[in-house]
Amino acid sequence: MFKDINNYVKQNYVVKQIDNKIQVNYTKLLLMGEIDFIEKWPKDDTETIVEIKCVNSINIKYYMQLLLYNFCYYCTRPNSKYSLYRNSFKIINLLTGIEYIFSVSVTPGNMFTILNTLAKVGGLTFSGMNLVYDLETTGAIENQGPFEHKPVIQRSQIYFRNNKYYAIIYPEIIEIAIKDYETGLIIMNKLVKANSTLTLGIQNITGITPNMLVGQSTLDQIKVELEDKLKLFTACNMLAHNGNSFDNKIMLFYKLLNPQQVFFIDTLSVIPVHMESNSKLDKKNLSAIYYQLFKEKFQAHRAMNDVDALIKIMKYLKIEF
């Protein structure tokens, strides 16, 4: 087999630079494999992952294998111009003499589904993931009280202090986005159906209207889906901007996360210490930090937009976890 590969390469790859038998892995899921070779054209700065097969026919499993090789190879090369999720590939079938040249692409959300399915089938776990997330809600967290008698209030935590009752009232979630910091894998990006009416103020801030929430998943459905997606995660970091004061509290109140399974990191505390010594933050909200660093605005207060902005800020500051 290897003699056939070497002969093929010698006869057909005179100009290209060939790297063969490249070991690839994705350590956070313990995925590993070996690419037969990568053909490179230094002049054009292009490269193609090539697989050698000796089979009767090329089917979907070989395309899937290449997609996984591509992900594992380029996730360790974050500065590469090549994408984790789409690329051109080549399969050489020595049995038939046919060379297949094709492109494969997958969304970051579907790529996570593929990896999660592999984890379930193979008994693997995602370890040490850094998930950036954001919530859009129907309002702020409110504190009410004191009350002489224990009140009954929806979406609230009641506590007793100094012979009085107090209530912490939580808003409803109307959008949730979760993305892996290193690879951009999308774990969730969904609108959430609310039971209460969206105020005009919230509609103006977020751009989310009541019509957009019609037919969307309920919070209970989101909880089931998120539980299924994260059940194979261990030692996971959940990163949110101002998370300790807002997002983390809401996630825990609605029991969307298991506090024994995750560790919360508030980037409001992380970002300032990574600024250059001669540069201080004018303001600490996400939009202000983004504008200070990039001199442009982004469409804030949509969950995935906020997540992407936060990731861009942290990568610009070379923050690692």
From Swiss-Prot:
Keywords: Exonuclease, Hydrolase, Nuclease. InterPro entries: Exonuclease_RNaseT/DNA_pol3, PDDEXK-like_dom_sf, RNaseH-like_sf, RNaseH_sf. Residues 130-314 form the Exonuclease domain. One of its GO terms (molecular function) is nucleic acid binding. The keyword Hydrolase applies. Its EC number is 3.1.-.-. The keyword Nuclease applies. SMART domains: EXOIII. Transmembrane segments: none annotated. This is Uncharacterized exonuclease R569. The lineage of its organism: Viruses, Varidnaviria, Bamfordvirae, Nucleocytoviricota, Megaviricetes.
